[in-house]
A protein has these predicted regions:
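Surface-exposed acidic/polar loop and edge beta-strand patches at domain peripheries
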Residues: 1-130, 141-368
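Asparagine-centered strand-capping/turn motif at beta-strand->loop junctions
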Residues: 134-138
C-alpha cells in the first residue's frame, strides 16, 4: 500500500494515496497510544476475495476521507462518494513548519472541473489533525462531506454541539431483512436526540451507542445557531478515551451519523463490521443531484453544496482528535480558546487540550 506518514510531537497520521483515505492516526498521551480511527477488517485482503464490483474506496475503507460528492455521483459519473474517495492522490508538499508538520496532497482527477487539494497540518503537542480541502476552479456546484469513522469494542456515549433537528431519510440503508437490519424509523424526525423514533415503536437514545444493537442506521443532524464550533464527542468505553470531531457549521452545517454495527450480512461486510460510527460532517443532501436540486435541507435553510467557478477557490476545514478519558462520560460542552480546547464534563470539571483556536475560522464569512 502506498502510504505517506507525517508526524509532529505526540501525533502521527498516514494517508493511503491510492484512495485518499487516512490509513492510521496515533496520538500519544499519558503514556498511552490512542488510535481514534477505524479500518475495515477486510483492508489488505486479496482483491479476488472481495466482490468484483466493489468501489475502490470500499475495498480500502479506512479512517477519514473526502466525499465529493457525498453518496451517489449522479451528476458527473464516478464511484460512490466520488473520485476523491476512490482514486489516487499525489504528494505536492511535505515538510516541517514552525512547531509542526504540513503536507499537501492533490487529487489526480478533477471533480466538476475543479482541482482538489487536501492539506494536513500537525502541531507539536496538539492531539489533533487539522485538515483543509481546497477546490480551485471548476463550474457548477459540488456537495461535500468528511467521512471519519471510529470503532468501539464495548460501545460508548456520544455528545454533540447543539442540534436543531435529527432526521432519517425515506428508506433505511438495509431495508431487505435477508441482507441486513436497522432499528430507527424511516422517515422520522425529532428535536430531542435522546428520544428518536424506532421502527418497532417507542424511542431510542441516539447518544448511547450500544454494542449489542446489531444494525445499520443513518441519520442527519442539523446544526443549531449557537456561534461556536460544531463538535461531536465519542467517549469509548473499552478504549477509555475521547474522540473529538470539530467543524465550522457555516461551512459544514450538518453531521450525518452512520451506525454500522454488524447490520450488513453480505460481502465484504458479512456481519463483521462491528462497533463502527461514522461522523460525517457535510454540506450535502444524499447524492449529488439531490444536493443541487430541491431537497428537505434547503427548506430548513441549510446549504447543500459549494458553488464552483473558474478563477476562484472554496475551502472548508475540519479537525479530528483524541484524548485519554476514564469513566466513559462524554463532555457537556466543548469551548474553543485561541490556544486551547476546553472540554467540560457534566459535573463541571474541565480539561484543556492544546488547540489552534483560529483554525476553524468560526464567525468568518464563507463562500456560497
Amino acid at each position: 500500500m502506498d502510504t505517506v506518514t507525517i508526524g509532529a510531537k505526540g501525533i502521527s497520521v498516514s494517508l493511503d494515496l491510492a484512495v485518499g483515505h487516512i490509513a492510521g492516526m496515533e496520538v500519544e498521551a499519558d503514556g498511552r497510544v490512542l488510535k481514534p480511527l477505524h479500518r475495515a477488517p477486510w483492508v489488505g485482503s486479496p482483491r479476488e476475495s472481495l466482490p468484483e464490483n466493489l468501489p475502490e474506496g470500499t475495498v480500502r475503507l479506512s479512517g477519514d476521507f473526502l466525499c465529493a460528492p457525498f453518496s451517489a455521483s449522479d451528476v458527473e459519473a464516478a464511484p460512490l462518494h466520488g473520485w476523491s474517495a476512490n482514486s489516487a492522490w499525489d504528494v505536492v508538499e511535505n515538510g516541517a513548519i514552525a512547531g509542526g508538520w504540513r503536507a499537501v496532497f492533490r487529487l489526480r482527477r478533477k471533480v466538476m472541473g475543479a482541482t482538489i487539494d487536501k492539506v494536513f497540518t500537525l502541531r507539536d503537542g496538539h492531539p489533533f489533525l487539522y485538515q483543509e480541502h481546497v477546490f480551485s476552479g471548476g463550474s457548477g456546484a459540488i456537495s461535500v462531506a468528511h467521512h471519519p469513522m471510529t470503532v468501539m469494542q464495548g460501545g460508548g456515549r456520544l455528545a454533540f454541539s447543539p442540534k436543531r433537528v435529527a432526521v432519517t431519510p425515506a428508506t433505511p440503508l438495509e431495508p431487505d431483512p435477508a441482507r441486513g437490519r436497522f432499528m430507527l424509523a424511516y422517515p422520522a424526525r425529532a428535536s430531542d436526540l435522546t428520544r428518536f423514533p424506532l421502527a418497532a415503536g417507542g424511542a431510542t437514545d441516539l447518544t448511547d451507542y450500544r454494542a449489542e444493537d446489531r444494525r445499520e442506521d443513518f441519520i442527519t443532524l442539523v446544526e443549531a445557531d449557537h456561534g461556536g464550533p460544531g463538535w461531536t464527542a465519542i467517549a469509548r468505553r473499552a478504549e477509555q478515551d475521547l474522540v473529538l470531531v470539530l467543524k465550522n457549521p457555516a461551512e459544514l452545517p450538518i453531521t450525518m451519523l452512520w451506525f454500522s454495527n454488524g447490520g450488513r450480512d453480505y460481502a465484504p461486510w458479512s456481519g463483521r463490521h462491528i462497533g463502527v460510527l461514522g461522523i460525517e460532517d457535510g454540506r450535502t443532501a444524499i447524492g449529488h443531484a439531490a444536493s443541487l436540486g430541491d431537497n428537505w435541507l434547503k427548506h430548513e435553510g441549510v446549504a447543500t453544496a459549494f458553488a464552483l467557478a473558474e478563477g476562484r477557490s472554496v475551502s472548508f476545514r475540519h479537525v479530528i482528535g483524541a484524548a485519554p478519558l476514564a469513566g466513559g462520560e462524554p463532555p457537556s460542552s466543548v469551548e474553543s480558546a485561541p490556544d486551547r480546547l476546553r472540554v467540560v464534563t457534566a459535573g463541571g470539571a474541565a480539561r484543556e487540550l492544546s488547540f489552534d483556536g483560529g483554525f476553524l475560522r468560526i464567525g468568518r464569512s464563507v463562500p456560497a
